[in-house]
Amino acid sequence: GPWLIDVQGNRYFDAISSWWVNLFGHSDLGLRAAIGEQLQRLPHVMLAGCTHEPAVRLAERLSARTGGALGHCFFASDGASAVEIALKQSFHSWRNRGFPNKKQFVCLKNGYHGETLGALAVTDVQIFKDAYGPLLMQSHQVESPDTRLSNEAASLQAMAQLHLDQRNDQ
């Protein structure tokens, strides 16, 4: 659960949950059992051109949740790595289609995506921009959608079109 216990036995509600996110709480019994069971079967396999049954089952469950729209799954070891891989796949896709200059990215203002260089490039946290700006690829921040506004979809579409019109070869 969300509780941390110090050496004196004091309990603290973990409102920080690691630096940025902790999806599962601390020491969840079901998660511990599933990890232990998997360790007994296959502790680690690199999914580079191969797979295993739990990965296949998870991919099928994810695809089913999208109504079958998700045709492929790529599993990464953590969120920052997943963002990094998505950026590389996007660049690679554009390059393969004859657009090697498309190497800038659009991201949401105030977004945080991890601390690899690629993830930091699409993160809008000033302390990271100040520290690592010269190392980061170029990105453009746009306002986050506000679903409380009735015309949000139209304004978001107009903003996206304006952004693309200004940078269509990037």
Outline where the language-model segments fall.
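Active-site and channel-lining beta-strand-loop segments
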Residues: G1-D14
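A structural motif shared across PLP-dependent enzymes of the aminotransferase-like
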Residues: G1-W3, W20-E37, A48-E60, A121
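Short acidic (Asp/Glu) and glycine-rich catalytic loops that position anionic groups and cofactors
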Residues: R11-A15, E37-R41
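Histidine-centered active-site/metal-ligand motif
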Residues: H26, H44, H113
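Short, flexible active-site-proximal loops enriched in glycine and acidic residues
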Residues: V45-E53, A69-C73
